[in-house]
Curated annotation (Swiss-Prot):
GO biological process, one term: positive regulation of cytokine production
Localisation per UniProt entry: Secreted
UniProt organism field: Bos taurus (Bovine)
Protein name: Interleukin-15
High-level lineage: Eukaryota, Metazoa, Chordata, Craniata, Vertebrata
Main localization, broad class: secreted
Top-rank taxon, per record: Eukaryota
UniProt keyword annotation of Glycoprotein present: yes
UniProt family annotation: Belongs to the IL-15/IL-21 family.
InterPro entries in UniProt: 4_helix_cytokine-like_core, IL-15, IL-15/IL-21_fam, IL-15_mml
Length: 162
């Protein structure tokens, strides 16, 4: 099972600060490390994790077919691009229903990993309020198969805008 740690990017800044505090800043190499560290801290974070989210969703779909689960979930089928963060948060909440209904250890691990990946990607997006978006409970209830198909569509919206 792969577990990605998207929070490791911030540790490089801590390393640079440690170098600075240990008086390495006075050497030419220390100055180069400090300047490169400042530049790398300002670079945008790559969002390659969305493809892993899609892969995890496909794995969940295959596992659910094997255990014959037939729950209905609140599903955003035609999300407006301005509401994609709200839609993603609803999808992540509904994943908890799959987790509860399946009681499968493999599905549990995949959903935990998927949630971590999606939340790390969402954390890099500005926290802006999306007006006019539907609440999760206002969405239509659909089958798990339809839910996962719509979930992949929302993830692709994030991939296309990054």
């Amino acid at each position: 099972m792969r577990i990605l740690k998207p929070y490791l990017r911030s540790t490089s800044i801590q390393c640079y600060l440690c170098l600075l505090l240990n008086s390495h800043f006075l050497t030419e190499a220390g100055i180069h490390v400090f300047i490169l560290g400042c530049i790398s801290a300002s670079l945008p974070k790559t969002e390659a994790n969305w493809q892993y989210v899609i892969n995890d969703l496909k794995t969940i779909e295959h596992l659910i077919q094997s255990i014959h689960m037939d729950a209905t979930l609140y599903t955003e089928s035609d999300a407006h691009p301005n509401c994609k963060v709200t839609a993603m948060q609803c999808f992540l909440l509904e994943l908890r229903v799959i987790l509860h209904e399946s009681k499968n250890a493999t599905i549990y691990e995949i959903i935990e990993n998927l949630t971590m990946l999606a939340n790390s990607n969402l954390s890099s997006i500005e926290n802006k309020t999306e007006l006019g978006c539907k609440e999760c409970e206002e969405l239509e209830e659909k089958s798990i198969k339809e839910f996962l198909k719509s979930f992949v569509h929302i993830v692709q919206m994030f991939i296309n805008t990054s």
